[in-house]
């Protein structure tokens, strides 16, 4: 195939046309435009049929572009092609605007016909304007090329800046807003008013200080007195934030797992977040004025008077803080913290000037001599159900732990009744109830053991005396203790026997129900087996596999639901068991009270009878018989007054 291009303006054909005159045009011969004279005008290729469709002109490639042509892709070649057409259009339009003679010459070239050319190929030489879409594409390609050149010169900072600008331009998709409910949520402890924090996290011993302050001071008294630069060296921020979040959730983290500097930073953070000054805005100027007194006695007296005017919460917190810091200063050899260092650290934290802090630290005994830092005792935990926690051994320790657990139980009930839904608090509630049940049971056992030891001691002391003295001077207190113990044991035994019979009947009914259900299952399986032998299954293997998958999914779902129900059932059974024990205990106490009441009425009647008869008292030997008769009467029979314990 032979392709034809317009010759350049400086070609020999233009010179010939200029020599022949401007008014005449002639058709050039085949020799004048032969390929040997104009090698760039024709390009030989495969021959094409004479009436072929319209072909696009090939790309015009320069020498410089040929060197780099192998490194460029299709996109670069298309750019060159479009640029070549634009240049050709601008040159031709400019020539046409300059002189009409050139237009005529160009018409002459268009009129020229060669036998191998068709009418359709003549259209390739006509200059047409490109549509708007192609112009828009060209401009877009040029902009992209310009951006690529700029991107090569970009640094990392420029790339990050450009990415941020693109991110700002993008509008975030607006998600549908969820209607907010008015459910109460826990407010943070850090930054809360001091009185509010005290009411929410006060310890069981009644000292009106927040738990975070008490526990931090207690930890620092144990582990921070040998740490160099304590309160000056900051702790790890991530751990401090972790502890802060735990206290904001009203939890009690184990500070033993953290370093002293971390706990010290937590304490400073709490003091820094207090919404009000410890010395209050009204009294702060007066404290500053008191520092300017001439004598130390006047300073101390004025400070004592101003401290009495402080609110109760502020005075208590300030006294504990100053006494604790005085302990740190006393360990200056280990901590390397003297009055000046502590004042520099504490002044911006609590917003108190160095002058006031210096007076407080130098007169601790006169101002806070009666303050004693009481150690914190954590309530007992029972997080692992597989192991039993170590309970106190003495009655005093058990009673103290019961007070702690009851205080914690009341706090949990208050939070849950306030509408705050917290699964961890619900679990802690069950845990506290289990601990209380175990503690009360152990307290009863301790009282019983103490009573038995006391009785054994009394019996041992009485065995040394004569039999006659034992009969006449028998200790009424020991008899009463024995009777009370015997009555309590017998009544408790009766209640437990009644509960045992009730549980046995319930177990028997459950076994019958299990046997009935097993029989029904066996009958259903036999029916299905017989039906499978008589029926013919014509379903495809694909439908059977799908049914099996659906049945497997349903089975897994049912198993998961069954596990959840078993867990709930275990919790309910445990709660029912604990309630039954409490009911048995109450019934025993009720029956004991009834027995004591009947015994007191009987004694009153016996005392009234001798008075009616003339004041004749019973013989000494009759006293022993009456005591033994009272023992036999106080013993309840196992078959009498037996009641079943309902669920």
Swiss-Prot record:
Name of the molecule in the record: RalA-binding protein 1
Region of interest (Mediates interaction with REPS1 and REPS2), residue spans: 500-647
Source species, domain of life: Eukaryota
GO molecular function annotations of the record: ABC-type glutathione S-conjugate transporter activity; ABC-type xenobiotic transporter activity; ATP binding; ATPase-coupled transmembrane transporter activity; GTPase activator activity; small GTPase binding; transmembrane transporter activity; xenobiotic transmembrane transporter activity
Catalytic activity reported: an S-substituted glutathione(in) + ATP + H2O = an S-substituted glutathione(out) + ADP + phosphate + H(+); ATP + H2O + xenobioticSide 1 = ADP + phosphate + xenobioticSide 2; leukotriene C4(in) + ATP + H2O = leukotriene C4(out) + ADP + phosphate + H(+)
Record: residues binding ATP: 69-74, 418-425
GO terms for biological process, alphabetical: cell division; doxorubicin transport; endocytosis; negative regulation of smooth muscle cell proliferation; positive regulation of mitochondrial fission; positive regulation of oxidative stress-induced neuron intrinsic apoptotic signaling pathway; positive regulation of protein phosphorylation; receptor-mediated endocytosis
Location relative to the cell: Cell membrane; Cytoplasm, Cytosol; Cytoplasm, Cytoskeleton, Spindle pole; Nucleus
Free-text domain note: The Rho-GAP domain mediates the GTPase activator activity toward CDC42.
Extent of Acidic residues compositional bias: 535-550
Biased composition (Basic and acidic residues): 52-68, 119-151, 628-647
Keywords of this entry: Acetylation, ATP-binding, Cell cycle, Cell division, Cell membrane, Cytoplasm, Cytoskeleton, GTPase activation, Membrane, Mitochondrion, Mitosis, Nucleotide-binding, Nucleus, Phosphoprotein, Translocase, Transport
Gene field: Ralbp1
Subunit comment: Interacts with the GTP-bound form of RALA (via effector domain); during mitosis, recruits RALBP1 to the mitochondrion where it promotes DNM1L phosphorylation and mitochondrial fission. Interacts with DNM1L; mediates its mitotic kinase cyclin B-CDK1-mediated phosphorylation during mitosis to promote mitochondrial fission. Interacts with the mitotic kinase cyclin B-CDK1 during mitosis. Interacts with the GTP-bound form of RALB (via effector domain). Interacts with REPS1; the interaction is direct and does not affect RALA-binding nor GTPase activator activity of RALBP1.
Membrane-related topology note: Peripheral membrane protein
Annotated GO CC locations: cytosol; membrane; mitochondrion; nucleus; plasma membrane; Schaffer collateral - CA1 synapse; spindle pole
EC number: 7.6.2.2, 7.6.2.3
């Amino acid at each position: 195939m032979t392709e034809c291009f317009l010759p350049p303006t400086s070609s020999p054909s233009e010179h010939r046309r200029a020599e022949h005159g401007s008014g005449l045009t002639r058709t050039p011969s085949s020799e004048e435009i032969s390929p040997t004279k104009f090698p760039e005008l024709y390009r030989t290729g495969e021959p094409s049929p004479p009436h072929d469709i319209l072909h696009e002109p090939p790309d015009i490639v320069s020498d410089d572009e040929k060197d780099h042509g192998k490194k460029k892709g299709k996109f670069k070649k298309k750019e060159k092609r479009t640029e070549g057409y634009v240049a050709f259009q601008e040159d031709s339009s400019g020539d046409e605007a300059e002189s009409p003679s050139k237009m005529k010459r160009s018409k002459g070239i268009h009129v020229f016909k060669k036998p191998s050319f068709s009418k359709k190929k003549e259209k390739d030489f006509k200059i047409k304007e490109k549509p708007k879409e192609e112009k828009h594409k060209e401009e877009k390609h040029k902009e992209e090329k310009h951006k690529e050149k700029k991107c090569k010169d970009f640094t990392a900072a420029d790339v990050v800046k450009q990415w941020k600008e693109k991110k700002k331009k993008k509008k975030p998709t607006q998600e549908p807003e969820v209607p907010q409910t008015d459910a109460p949520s826990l407010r943070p402890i850090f930054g809360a008013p001091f009185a509010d924090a005290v009411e929410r996290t006060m310890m069981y011993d009644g000292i009106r200080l927040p738990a975070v302050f008490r526990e931090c001071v207690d930890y620092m008294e144990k582990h921070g007195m040998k740490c160099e630069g304590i309160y000056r060296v900051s702790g790890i921020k991530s751990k401090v934030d972790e502890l802060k979040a735990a206290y904001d959730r009203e939890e009690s983290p184990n500070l033993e797992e953290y370093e002293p500097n971390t706990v010290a930073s937590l304490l400073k953070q709490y003091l820094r977040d207090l919404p009000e000054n410890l010395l209050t805005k009204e009294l702060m100027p007066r404290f500053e004025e008191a520092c300017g007194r001439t004598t130390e006695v006047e300073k101390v007296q004025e400070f004592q008077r101003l401290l009495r005017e402080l609110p109760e919460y502020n005075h208590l917190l300030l006294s504990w803080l100053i006494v604790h810091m005085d302990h740190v200063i006393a360990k200056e050899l280990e901590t390397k913290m003297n009055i000046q260092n502590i004042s520099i650290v504490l002044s911006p934290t609590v917003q108190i000037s160095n002058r006031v802090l210096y007076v407080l630290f130098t007169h601790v005994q006169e101002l806070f001599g009666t303050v004693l830092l009481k150690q914190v005792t954590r309530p007992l935990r029972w997080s692992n159900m597989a192991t039993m926690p170590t309970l106190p051994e003495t009655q005093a320790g058990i009673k103290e732990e019961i007070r702690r657990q009851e205080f914690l139980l009341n706090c949990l009930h208050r939070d849950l009744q306030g509408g705050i839904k917290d699964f961890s608090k619900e679990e802690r509630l069950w845990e506290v109830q289990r601990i209380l049940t175990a503690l009360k049971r152990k307290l009863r056992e301790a009282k019983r053991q103490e009573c038995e030891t006391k009785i054994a001691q009394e019996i041992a002391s009485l065995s040394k005396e004569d039999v006659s003295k034992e009969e006449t001077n028998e200790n009424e207190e020991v008899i009463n203790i024995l009777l009370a113990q015997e009555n309590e044991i017998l009544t408790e035994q009766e209640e437990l026997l009644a509960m045992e019979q009730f549980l046995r009947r319930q177990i028997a009914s459950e076994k019958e129900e299990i046997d009935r259900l097993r029989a029904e299952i066996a009958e259903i399986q036999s029916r299905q087996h017989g039906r499978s032998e008589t029926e013919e299954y014509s379903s495809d293997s694909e439908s059977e596999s799908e049914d099996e998958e659906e049945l497997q999914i349903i089975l897994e779902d049912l198993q998961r639901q069954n596990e959840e129900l078993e867990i709930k059932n275990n919790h309910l059974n445990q709660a029912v068991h604990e309630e039954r024990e409490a009911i048995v205990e109450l019934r025993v106490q009720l029956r004991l009270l009834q027995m004591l009441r009947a015994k007191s009425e009987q004694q009153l009647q016996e005392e009234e009878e001798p008075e009616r008869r003339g004041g004749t008292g019973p013989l000494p030997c009759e006293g022993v018989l009456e005591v033994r008769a009272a023992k036999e009467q106080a013993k309840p029979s196992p078959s009498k007054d037996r009641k079943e314990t309902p669920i």
